[in-house]
Amino acid sequence: MRNKPRIRFKGFTEDWEQRKLSEVVTINPKTELPDKFKYVDLESVVGTNLLGFQVIKKENAPSRAQRLASYGDVFYQTVRPYQRNNYLFANIDKDMVFSTGYAQLRSKLYNYFLLTLVQNDNFVKVVLDNCTGTSYPAINGSELGKITVQIPSNDAEANQIGKVFRGIDNIITLHQRKLEKLKLAKKALLQKLFPKNGSQFPEIRFKGFTDAWEQRKLGDIATFSKGNGYSKSDLALSGNPIILYGRLYTNYETTISNVDTFVELKDKSVLSQGGEVIVPASGENAEDISRASVVKNQGIIIGGDLNVIKANHLLDPTFLALTISNGGQQKELSKRAQGKSVVHLHNSDLQEVNLIFPLLNEQKEISTLFEKMDNIITLHQRKLDRLQEVKIGLLQKMFV
């Protein structure tokens, strides 16, 4: 077994030590809870960020409220640990209490080194191997303490490593906040540039446009078809670009110009001509599938379980995708989606949607604005992805 990391700071050459986690941290130290405190449950930490807490009295607190935080404690998610929602408590509050869904790790090690250690792939893999349960795999504090870890024999090296990853995480958090602000700005503009509550006039408009918006059924001004075939198992490293329906939720904004998934072309594949608006035909809930994207380029395969809309001369495709995904049209789509564990949306449902739209020139102004915003959002997302890749690479090389 390798006992030295591949990348080290100058001056450190000693082998790393192999220790049980319980030998380097105190797990779930016993404390007395205050009469009133800020309670952090399992949904309150995402990644390494604390999203919020509840202020509650001790007598009203859930039985899981037991871990009173102290400066430097690391709270490790023991239920579904593959999510890696772990938090370093780095403030001086004396009244924050975490759920027993976290293991409380208190150590003399540099605390950011410890946080990074428990986020590492190697550690998470061993934890999962020792979990019980399938739907909600979990590990208790006793079993967690038995896990073997490798740490520097010199505390100064651990401190240096921790500082590197603290800096990287701070930069990642900054980019995440910028990205979230951009998405919120887009959402706010969508609410103001499209009419609400049955009105024919939006709250704000581009200069020179004053006419009322027109209302028509989507089926009167567009044609409809379906994508065809393909699943995740068909994906390849290269070949013909393809849009799979599941990636509409996570990988694409309103406009799709660049596609990073590929397959080998099959017979009867549906290829884009440019300007198709695609809407998921199924999903886990109505909100997921009540959204649309426009395929900008030709020659992209449109996979199965996608409804395909081709607008006529009255509609700009990007505008159509925007209006389907927001406001009254999105609410109408949500109501038409049918199903329980899986909901479905058919072209026949789309045809009945009441669409409200302005003249083509105003549509294009709106589309151009949001295409520019999407480009900026995509650019920031790529920067964030690259930073996360850098972090993963360093984790692999700076830990044993």
Where are these regions (language model features)?
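Sequence-specific dsDNA recognition surfaces
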Residues: 22-29, 43-71, 219-231, 246-276
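Hydrophobic pocket-lining residues within nucleotide cofactor-binding pockets
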Residues: 45, 144, 194, 248, ...
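Short, ligand-facing micro-motifs at secondary-structure edges
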Residues: 35-55, 71-98, 112-117, 125-129, ...
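Short, well-ordered beta-strand elements within core beta-sheets of diverse protein domains
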Residues: 7-10, 103-106, 146-150, 204-207, ...
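Amphipathic alpha-helical segments with low aromatic content
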Residues: 1-17, 147, 154-214, 361-400
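A short glycine-rich beta-alpha junction/loop motif
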Residues: 2-3, 96-101, 132-157, 300-306, ...
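Non-catalytic DNA-recognition/assembly elements of restriction-modification systems
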Residues: 8-31, 205-227, 352
